[in-house]
Amino acid sequence: MGRVLQKKKNRSSTPKQRPKRTGQLKSGKKKINVLGNAIIAQNWDRKLTLTQNYRRLGLVHKLNAPTGGSEKKPTKDGRIEELPEDPLHIRSSAKASAKQAAMGETRVERDPETGKIIRVIRDEEEIEIAGRKVKPSNPLNDPLNELSEDEAARQPASQRTNAKSAVVQQLERQADQEGKAVKAKKPRHQSKREEEWIMRLIERHGENYSAMARDRKLNPMQQSEGDLKRRIRKWKANHSS
C-alpha cells in the first residue's frame, strides 16, 4: 500500500514536471539567433564572443554606449589607452547631452503657424589667434580648406566605402536586393471563383454597386461598395481584350 501523501500527489491535477521554456535562456531573456543571416553565419567564429565577432565583422551589436566591462589595453608607456567616442552611440543620459551642447545664444527657425522650433541654426563663430580672427575649423586661414571639403563631399560612394569590411558590403548588397524585390512585388491576380462571383453580381445588378453591397445572398461577406467597384474594374481590365 502506498502512502497517503503519495496518493494525493498522483490524484492532483498539477503537472509533475514543469514544461520547458522554448526560446528562453535561464535568466528569462529571449534567446536571439545571431546566425539567422547566411552571410553572418558563414563568417562567424564560434571561438569568439558575440562582441568580438561583431567587432571583427565591422558590426555593432548595441547602439548604446558601453557602461562598463570593456577592455582597455595599456600602451607602451604603461598608460591606459582612451578609445575615441563612436559618433553612432546613443547617449542615454540627459546630462551627457547637456554637456555636449555649448552654452550661449543661437538662432532658431520656427514654424510660422505653430511657433514651434523646427531647427537650430548654429553659426561657426570666429576665434582670435595672434590678433587675427579665424574659424576653429581653419585656424591657419588656408584658402584651400573649403575646396578640400567640397572634394571630399563629391567623392564617389565606392571610394568612401573602402573602409567598410567585406561582410558589411555583402549585407548592404543583400538589403538592397531585398528592397528592390519588395518594390517589384507582383500584383494579385483574381481567382476563377472570384471572377465567377463578379460575373453573377453583374448579371443580377448590372452597374448598381449599392445593390451589390446590400445583396446578402451573393455578397455574404458584406464587401463594401468601393471594394466591389475596384474588383469589377480590375475584372473588366482583364477581360477587355
Curated annotation (Swiss-Prot):
InterPro entries, sorted? Ribosome_biogenesis_Nop16
Q: What is its main location?
A: nucleus
Give a yes or no for keyword Transport in this entry: no
- Which region ranges are annotated with the description Disordered? 1-30, 64-86, 92-111, 130-193, 211-241
Keyword rRNA processing set for record: yes
UniProt keywords (A-Z) are: Nucleus, Ribonucleoprotein, Ribosome biogenesis, rRNA processing
Where does this protein reside within or beyond the cell?
A: Nucleus, Nucleolus
Q: Which Pfam families match?
A: Nop16
Its biological purpose = Involved in the biogenesis of the 60S ribosomal subunit.
PANTHER family with a match to the protein in the record? HSPC111 PROTEIN-RELATED, NUCLEOLAR PROTEIN 16
Family membership noted in the UniProt record = Belongs to the NOP16 family.
* The protein's name: Nucleolar protein 16
Q: Which organism is it from?
A: Aspergillus fumigatus (strain ATCC MYA-4609 / CBS 101355 / FGSC A1100 / Af293) (Neosartorya fumigata)
